């Protein structure tokens, strides 16, 4: 068995910087640990909200981000500035927005309990109603989420609001939706 040792995290970030921008945007530090330790780079804007069955810890290493939340029937923004930390409780719908080029955040969350499902939700930009919810067993953020997004973006029926009929734009949020 190999001996445990530390490594320089900034060097790791520098070596993986090419993966911390679109279209990938994030990279897990370890694939085989009980914690999912993910480094996320900007720019990144998304239109979905994540329903996570476990807590998420956010540490904004470089630049600023906004965590859009939907809680108790209300949408609101939580700015997370460079150097800030934030602990998100389980099942609070959230949409991380990192519009700044070169921004870097660290997100730490436990692996899911056996059988626990994550969900990705999209809400109507017109009336605020839930447009679509996709549930999944999440093991790797990098590997498991992209197919869920691609399926939603490709399906106009899934993107049609059942309340007002507006078509969700898919990948691109409306102009001005993200404000730092």
UniProtKB/Swiss-Prot annotation:
Cystine pairings recorded for this chain: none
Reaction equations catalysed: 3-hydroxyanthranilate + O2 = (2Z,4Z)-2-amino-3-carboxymuconate 6-semialdehyde
Annotated positions binding Fe cation 1: 50, 56, 94
Enzyme Commission identifier(s): 1.13.11.6
Residues bound to substrate: 56, 98, 109
UniProt-annotated binding residues for O2: 46
PANTHER family noted in UniProt: 3-HYDROXYANTHRANILATE 3,4-DIOXYGENASE
Family named by the database record: Belongs to the 3-HAO family.
NCBIfam families for this protein: anthran_nbaC, PRK13264.1
Protein name: 3-hydroxyanthranilate 3,4-dioxygenase
Organism: Ruegeria pomeroyi (strain ATCC 700808 / DSM 15171 / DSS-3)
Lineage: Bacteria, Pseudomonadati, Pseudomonadota, Alphaproteobacteria, Rhodobacterales
């Amino acid at each position: 068995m190999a001996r445990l040792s530390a490594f320089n995290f900034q060097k790791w970030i520098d070596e993986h910087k090419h993966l911390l921008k679109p279209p990938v945007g994030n990279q897990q530090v370890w694939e085989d640990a009980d914690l999912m330790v993910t480094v996320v780079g900007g720019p990144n804007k998304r239109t979905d909200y994540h329903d996570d069955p476990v807590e998420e810890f956010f540490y904004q290493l470089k630049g600023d981000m906004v965590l859009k939340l939907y809680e108790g029937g209300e949408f609101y923004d939580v700015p997370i500035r460079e150097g800030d930390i934030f602990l998100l409780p389980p099942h609070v719908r959230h949409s991380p927005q990192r519009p700044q080029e070169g921004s870097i955040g660290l997100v730490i969350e436990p692996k899911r309990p056996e059988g626990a499902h994550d969900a990705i939700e999209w809400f109507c930009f017109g009336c605020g109603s839930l447009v679509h919810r996709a549930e999944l067993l999440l093991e790797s953020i990098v590997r498991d989420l992209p197919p869920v997004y691609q399926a939603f973006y490709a399906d106009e029926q899934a993107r049609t609001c059942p309340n007002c009929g507006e078509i969700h734009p898919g990948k691109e949020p409306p102009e001005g939706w993200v404000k730092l």
